[in-house]
């Protein structure tokens, strides 16, 4: 069953039963109590203890404390799987909050009080050569213009909601919008239909769904749905049991991620 250089993407494509086999092989404790993403990260962590491995995450920089940062591989949020990134690496490649950074990672040194993983070598920033990151523009310096490219949302003949948007409230790339509706009016279903339209009609676009102050079961439902329509789509969340500071932090990280995509000329 052993496979070298497993990545989080590799494991997320496998069934939970298959990941259990890796967990048993690496002798991971209490693996049956973990969800799929937590277990996948635990397998990668166990693999790292045997050899260097490649991992990626969303960068959060602490400018007020020396300029170092952490890669957040799990839900844009702090976790024990975070990867330390030195200030010198951040400065060398001109990295910013919200960048997706990938590279070779080393496990914590034995006997050290530091239990964090460390980035040894950066080989990709937002999926491209890291040297390209230094020459990109800054989001505040970009010129705002009116949308000039329509985003078609209709994707299912049986669904009239997205068809009505296209007819009466058309949406363009770069446009902001708001859904105003009372509770239990079907906003979640509406968002699902919009996500399906983006995934079908704008395949090169990056789909990120942000859920704030929602129930955990709503998060699970959206995660399952988004993964079924768009393998590269993301669901980022801060559920109602989290502190308000968590809601703000997650929202800011997703906004930073969106700005980095725009700087990279991605939709």
Stretch-by-stretch model annotation:
Residues 1-51:
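Basic helix-extension-helix modules of the SAP/HeH family
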Residues 5, 9-13, 29-37, 111-116, ...:
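Conserved phosphate/pyrophosphate-binding and hydrolysis machinery centered on Walker-type P-loop NTPases
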Residues 19, 39, 69, 86, ...:
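Residue-level signature of catalytic and energy-coupling elements of molecular machines
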Residues 32, 37-133:
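N-terminal "pre-motor" subdomain/linker immediately upstream of P-loop NTPase catalytic cores
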Residues 53-55, 160-164, 254-259:
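Phosphate-interacting basic helix/loop segments used at nucleotide- and nucleic-acid interfaces
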Residues 105-110, 120-163:
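Phosphate-binding P-loop/Walker A region and its immediate neighborhood
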Residues 144-146, 150-251:
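Phosphate-binding glycine-rich loops and their immediate beta-loop-alpha structural context
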Residues 246-267:
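Phosphate-binding/switch loop-helix module in NTP-utilizing enzymes
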């Amino acid at each position: 069953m052993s496979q070298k250089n497993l990545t989080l993407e590799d494991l997320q494509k496998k069934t939970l039963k298959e990941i259990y086999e890796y967990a048993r092989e690496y002798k991971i404790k209490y693996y049956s109590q973990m969800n799929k993403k937590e277990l996948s990260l635990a397998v990668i962590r166990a693999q790292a203890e045997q050899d260097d491995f490649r991992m990626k995450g969303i960068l959060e920089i602490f400018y007020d404390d020396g300029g170092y940062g952490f890669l957040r591989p799990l839900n844009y949020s702090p976790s024990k799987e975070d990867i330390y990134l030195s200030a010198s690496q951040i400065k060398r490649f001109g990295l910013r909050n919200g960048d997706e950074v990938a590279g070779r990672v080393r496990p914590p040194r034995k006997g050290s009080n530091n239990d964090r993983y460390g980035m040894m070598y950066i080989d990709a920033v937002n999926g491209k050569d890291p040297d390209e990151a230094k020459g990109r523009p800054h989001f505040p310096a970009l010129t705002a213009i009116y949308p000039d490219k329509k985003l078609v949302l209709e994707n299912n003949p049986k669904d009239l909601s997205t068809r009505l948007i296209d007819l009466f409230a058309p949406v363009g790339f770069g446009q902001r919008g708001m859904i105003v509706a009372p509770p239990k009016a079907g906003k979640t279903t509406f968002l699902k239909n919009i996500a399906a339209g983006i995934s079908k009609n704008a395949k090169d676009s990056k789909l990120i769904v942000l859920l704030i102050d929602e129930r955990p079961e709503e998060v699970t439902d959206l995660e399952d749905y988004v993964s079924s329509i768009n393998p590269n789509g993301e669901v980022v969340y801060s559920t109602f049991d989290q502190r308000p500071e968590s809601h703000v932090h997650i929202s800011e990280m997703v906004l930073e991620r969106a700005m980095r995509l725009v700087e990279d000329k991605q939709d």
